[in-house]
Amino acid sequence: MKEISESYVPAVVENEVREYWKANNTYRETRKLHESGKPWLFVDGPPYTTGYIHLGTAWNKILKDAILRYHSMTGQHIIERAGYDMHGLPIEVKVEEKLGFKNKADIEKYGVAKFIEECREFALTHKDLMSEQFKDLGTWMDFDDPYQTVDKGYIEAAWYTLKRCEEEKMLERGSRVVNWCPRCGTAIADAEVEYWDETDPSIFVKFPIQGTENEYLVIWTTTPWTLPANVAVAVGEEFVYAKCRAVKDGKSEDLWIAKELAEQILKYGKYQDYSIIETKTGAELAGTKYISPLASAVPMQAQIEHRVVIADYVAMENTGMVHIAPGHGWDDYLVGLKENLPAVCPVDGNGNFTDEAGIFAGKYVKAPETNQEVIDVLGDAMLAVRKITHRYGHCWRCKTPIIYRATSQWFLKVKDIREKMLEEIADEVTWYPEWAGSARFHDWVEEARDWCISRQRYWGIPIPVWVCPVCNKYHVVGRYEELEQLSGQKMTDPHRPYVDDITIPCECGGTMKRIPDIFDVWYDSGIASWATLRFPEKPEDFGKYWPADFILEGHDQTRGWFYSQLALSTIAFGKAPYKSVLMHGFALDAEGKKMSKSLGNVIAPEDVAKQFGVDVMRQYILSANAPWDDMRFSLEGVKTNHRMFNVLWNVYKFPLPYMALDGYKPAAKDGVWDPSAVEDHISEFCREDRWLISRVNSLAEQVTKEMEVCNLHRATRPISTFILDELSRWYVQLVRPRMWLEEESVSKMQAYDTMYYVMRRLVTIFAPFAPHITECMYQNLRCEGDLPSVHMVDWFSGNDALRDPVLEEEMEIVQEFDEAVANARQNGKRKGRWPVGTVVVATDSEKVAGAVSAMNDMCCDRANARTVTVVKGVWDKLDWTAVPVMKVIGKQFGRDGPKVKAFIEEANGTKLKALLTADGKVSMEKDGFTAELTEEHMTFEEKMPENIFSSPMENGTIYVDVTLTPELEAEGYSREVIRRIQEMRKQAGLAVDAKIKAEVVIDDARVMPLVDSKHDVIETEVRANCLKIRVPDGETCSCRVADEAILAMDWEIDDLKVRISISKAE
């Protein structure tokens, strides 16, 4: 062991440690060390390789790294690879922005092959960039051989999985309504739709009832552009609808509206009067035929038989009648299936009306002017036009408003396996927290729809389906070898457009061509748990390690990665792909707002790490809150943790100079640290040593318990508390005098052994959370034959034989006593360095009395008191003041109440309390009025004797007598002088064992002799072999300090002027 730098400089520590890891290949060697251990498969949820990581990504990787390090140290064989999602719109949109493209037409014009190569380069470049950022967080994962969704082996795993879906008859092609991004020209998943508020028209339209005059159904919609695709009107089966004869400008119309909504709707339409002439239920209205008010503008509408249908999702709001366009809404689509309605969709992939939309053909449906044009064409059919602000969906990548559009797609029939999926997540998966699975994820799976896996884009895994245009037969290819055998062609790259050139002869004589679609990017990552094991290419690892033991991602992945994995695994293998899942929250700013550039509240993880250090950031992030709660990131919280790390460094640094002076070496066998030297002799150690050793073992047990259930916040917080409160503020203060002893001492050696033992255990416990500083400390502490890294050391879960719960409880009481004494001293304006004569502990608690009595010497030392005395109950030196309870007195004694009040206030409160305690009552007489009083008539307040100050502690009260005697004053001043000389030694850069000469000039003839009476004590404490204490006009110092002084300083000690000079002794 060697002495270390004075201050903790995170950047220096972390850079040196990373260089050490790199030079010694520590990550690989650590994994290799545990290859014979129990396998533990972790699958990294793959981030998109789109740019710099943000605070949420950093939190995610820090959580993963802490858990991986913990499981590695427990001796498990960790199987993991970093993962990257490198396909899909996240990459494509970034490349389109780079190339200045606005839509798919620009890509086609540029060339699909060139665009694919741009995407590949972008993804690989940013993968490398992100890997370095993750490494800078101290993350240990296999970044040299990550799983990448662009790799041939990974893509083959995706093909294999689809083949399994086809074999299980779970693959289906058909026309259904999907979320559609008109800019990207593709279907997108529900999980990829982002919602925010937008303002749209809110219109009420009159649909003429067939075969009537001036009789209408009144519908409401916020999407006028969908009216050219209207085929029906939905009503609530049991709702009551009114036929309202409404009058406006002298003309009347018969309008069908939900009865309880009619008055408000007619006000919107500015009708002057109305009467209800008929009512019907929705069931009675069902089947009513009507005519589209757009029949002349949209010829297709004239060919449709429009009618009223029943739908269970119709709400009693607006008009109570819903316009149905099965080609433009999922709920509408389901109604259409039930009622056999046509799903017309006169909108193309770019979001423009087709020729089927008549006069609207060619117009972009989400343009405000298009909605307005539809409104204008409706003309007299418009009852009212209003505005509404509501949540509307947008593409997650390009932020374009989505549309719902019926298109031909490929689906996995997830609805058919919902019950199996629910069984798996309930019975086979452990969730952290439990409600992540039983509530949030359960609810999502329970409502799962068939999964549209096809996307009409370019950069992705091509769907391995070849279709014959002659007979319409299709074939799903599961392996590259299979494709080459069927086609007779060699495949070099499974991406578009290269794979598109491969054709397969069909049995009918036609030529099968691959469909142009690629997989939904969620399909890509959904196969990660077996693709990372290189299955099906290398099936042996799949058989040994799958399913994954653990995965961890944010709560948005209940709709994303957790779900896509479960769906594909259940179809392909009949079971969940993971055994346990930790769901974490989102990273927000300190006020709970989402971080965004527009708000100016973005905090970059690299900036935090640069200012405070990676380990500090990790400890803050891990301890700030439960992993599954959203984290309100606070720089103040980071600063607090930074102070804790400085304290840890100082505690670690504290004994090293003394150990070096004494040539201390920890016990070792064959060069390996031997903790049994402490463990076998623990009973011989001082009480505070045994306590600290017990506490670090209790800490290890607690951290282990919390890590086993993913309570990382409850694992990390006690470590901070241990460092700050138990190591620094308590043990180091207790043991400091023993470290200063110059002579050989068993007690001093035991203090060294204790500090070494505790620091070795602490760096092990703290290693998963703060990997750099613990490695740095370990490298200095370790014995020659110890393992080369703290991260290779076996996890320490505590030694129960070294735990002493009784001693821990007693010491906790003494710590509470210490805090209470400090508070009482503060009240009495007596600093801790100044001794006091007496401290009294008044308590009814046997545990408090026992602890203070058993550790009386420690209590005296900590209180800086001559004596510490325990009294049972109330201290008899206290006086009491009686306070009348006027609320009770006034109610009972009425006009005589003032006499009772005066009696209580004038009486000796101490005697009154004694009488009440003895008899439960006291007789009074005042101005001829007599009565009996009880404790309900008065309360008592302590009346302190002079110079006595109190403070409560749990189950007791502390009383401190701050009266100064000459002896106490002498000791107080001497301690003040000692502290100043020690500070000057430090400023002068003197070694711990360096001898000095010192002169203390005190500007007070009364105080100087008091200080001089402690001459020998001061001389010993400051390691002076010559000390002179005098007043300014006294004799010249025989030590000749003033002439040789290396440092001279003026001090004020409670208004006392003191000049101190020190020089090196010869």
UniProtKB/Swiss-Prot annotation:
Record keyword ATP-binding present: yes
Sequence motif: 'HIGH' region, positions: 47-57
InterPro entries, sorted: aa-tRNA-synth_I_CS (IPR001412), aa-tRNA-synth_Ia (IPR002300), Anticodon_Ile_ABEc (IPR033709), Ile-tRNA-ligase (IPR002301), Ile-tRNA-ligase_type2 (IPR023586), M/V/L/I-tRNA-synth_anticd-bd (IPR013155), Rossmann-like_a/b/a_fold (IPR014729), tRNAsynth_Ia_anticodon-bd (IPR009080)
Pfam families registered for this protein in UniProt: Anticodon_1 (PF08264), DUF5915 (PF19302), tRNA-synt_1 (PF00133)
Cofactor(s) demanded: Zn(2+)
Chief place of localization: cytoplasm
Annotated signal peptide: none
Domain-related comment: IleRS has two distinct active sites: one for aminoacylation and one for editing. The misactivated valine is translocated from the active site to the editing site, which sterically excludes the correctly activated isoleucine. The single editing site contains two valyl binding pockets, one specific for each substrate (Val-AMP or Val-tRNA(Ile)).
Protein name: Isoleucine--tRNA ligase
Organism: Methanocorpusculum labreanum (strain ATCC 43576 / DSM 4855 / Z)
Native organism taxonomy: Archaea, Methanobacteriati, Methanobacteriota, Stenosarchaea group, Methanomicrobia
